[in-house]
């Protein structure tokens, strides 16, 4: 059971004051706030375990961004190595799910070798202030200026999926000897899992044109968004050893030639196909009560149609019951989305055109329901997890007081703005800690015995 805990801390920071606007959904009014502007197409945004937004920019930069202040800490600059043109550049990124013990970051990007545009997937290690390349997992993937794919996701079995586009070569998605136009599955060291459809190949599914969204929902289903040509953008369910039709089939199997191909080639039809096209980008599952219109639904950021699509599924998760479009034209083209544990939604914008005519003019926006008040979900046998931390702000060398209700036990973790763990204490009931740390903004996290978590900011003056 997930429990949501409110700890109210006011931090006065001039940097945190941004222009705000409101957006009406059905019955919920969302407040938007500019988190960070001046970005060069934020292609991937991830809510990190340090409560920062991790971001790739297409021209070749990776940063951690403080969602409260917008402060950007550059971890990696490969702009001299990354090939950026049209849709190519630094694209997908994923963090190791056990980041505290394995601070690995996986990043996919395009590069030039002679006159050839290629893709590679590299594993980096987070040092606390930067990213250091460790291994190249896959390289020499045929690329192009468009149709790159490059969305990454790590599954519960510690294997990783990577989407590759057709690289404008329609002969490759149906060629099982090519990794182009596919969903690839690999171990986290780049080796081939023995239970892949072909244990000698990374290929997990075939017939993809340009899949740019992959998400594993709580129901265990892998959903994927994919760009069609001039018709038939798709939302799919990904399955191993399935063929998704391209280039013979776009959208549904609904013509005689397509029907014949689908029957012979194990084609999986999409849940929905869009004509005219909408240009779907990334997807994510929203499971927080603060925005009822989004709760327990799949969100899709949309580029061409400049909106956020919200899907409700049947109980089995294999059929769409309702589809709603929100935020139409409010932020322009929407490239990516991530969600904070508080339920706040963060959107990466992509300007008003598919061409990057205005570099370093893109942004990350925050959406929140300011009317929402978190409540406790408890049972009679389980006491509420209540905690008070004071003073905040706190002076250097001063004692921090932590009060846990009913002598509960919890782990207290304090991180600096680079994500380094500076304090890790097991506490019970009332605890006093002497803070021997430098002045600055820190982030603390409580993890209780029954898995309840809460993180907030702490200012040391």
Kindly give the residue locations of the regions a language model identified.
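Beta-propeller fold detector
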Residues: 33-36, 72-79, 132-139, 194-202, ...
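Short, compositionally biased serine/threonine- and acidic-rich segments at solvent-exposed termini, linkers
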Residues: 368-376
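Beta-propeller blade signature
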Residues: 119-128, 176-188, 238-239, 362-368
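C-terminal outer-membrane/trafficking sorting elements
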Residues: 381-390, 394-461
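Acidic, Gly/Ser/Thr-rich repeat motifs that build Ca2+-stabilized beta-propeller blades
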Residues: 20-170, 216, 221-224, 228, ...
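Conserved blade-ending motifs and adjacent loop-strand segments that build the rim/top face
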Residues: 320-341
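Blade/loop signatures of beta-propeller domains
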Residues: 20-30, 130, 191-197, 251-265
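Bacterial Sec-dependent N-terminal signal peptides
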Residues: 1-21, 377
């Amino acid at each position: 059971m997930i429990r949501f805990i409110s700890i109210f801390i006011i931090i006065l920071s001039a940097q945190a004051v941004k222009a705000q606007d409101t957006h009406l959904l059905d019955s919920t009014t969302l407040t938007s706030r500019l988190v960070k502007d001046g970005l060069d197409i934020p292609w991937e945004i991830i809510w990190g375990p340090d409560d920062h937004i991790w971001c790739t920019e297409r021209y070749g930069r990776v940063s951690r961004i403080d969602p409260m202040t917008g402060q950007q800490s550059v971890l990696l600059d490969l702009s001299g190595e990354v090939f950026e043109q049209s849709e190519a550049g630094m694209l997908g990124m994923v963090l190791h799910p056990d980041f505290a013990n394995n601070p690995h970051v996986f990043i996919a990007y395009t590069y030039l070798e002679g006159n050839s545009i290629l893709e590679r997937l590299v594993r980096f290690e987070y040092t606390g202030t930067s990213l250091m390349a460790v291994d190249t997992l896959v390289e020499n993937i045929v690329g192009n200026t468009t149709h790159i794919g490059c969305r990454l996701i790590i599954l519960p079995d510690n294997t990783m999926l990577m989407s590759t586009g057709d690289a404008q070569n329609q002969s490759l998605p149906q060629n099982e000897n090519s990794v182009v136009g596919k969903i690839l599955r690999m171990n986290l060291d780049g080796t081939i899992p023995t239970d892949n459809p072909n244990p000698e190949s990374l290929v997990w599914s075939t017939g993809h044109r340009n899949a740019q969204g992959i998400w594993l929902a709580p129901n265990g289903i892998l959903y994927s968004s994919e760009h069609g040509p001039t018709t038939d953008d798709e939302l799919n369910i990904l399955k191993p050893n399935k063929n998704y039709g391209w280039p013979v089939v776009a959208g549904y199997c609904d013509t005689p030639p397509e029907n014949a191909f689908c029957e012979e080639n194990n084609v999986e039809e999409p849940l929905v196909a869009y004509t005219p096209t909408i240009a779907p980008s990334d997807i994510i599952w929203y499971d927080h009560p603060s925005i009822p219109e989004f709760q327990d639904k799949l969100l899709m950021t949309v580029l061409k149609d400049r909106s956020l699509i919200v899907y409700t599924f049947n109980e089995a998760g294999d059929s769409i019951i309702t589809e709603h479009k929100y935020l139409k034209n409010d932020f322009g083209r929407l490239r990516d989305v991530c969600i904070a544990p508080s339920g706040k939604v963060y959107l990466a914008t992509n300007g008003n055109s598919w061409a990057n005519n205005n570099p370093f003019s893109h942004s990350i926006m925050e959406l929140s329901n300011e009317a929402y008040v978190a409540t406790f979900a408890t049972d009679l046998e389980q006491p509420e997890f209540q905690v008070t931390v004071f003073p905040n702000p706190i002076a250097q060398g001063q004692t921090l007081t932590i009060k846990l209700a009913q002598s509960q036990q919890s782990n207290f973790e304090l991180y600096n703005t680079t994500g380094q763990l500076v304090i890790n204490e097991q506490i019970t009931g009332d605890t006093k800690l002497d803070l021997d740390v430098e002045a600055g903004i820190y982030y603390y996290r409580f993890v209780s015995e029954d898995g309840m978590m809460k993180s907030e900011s702490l200012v040391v003056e």
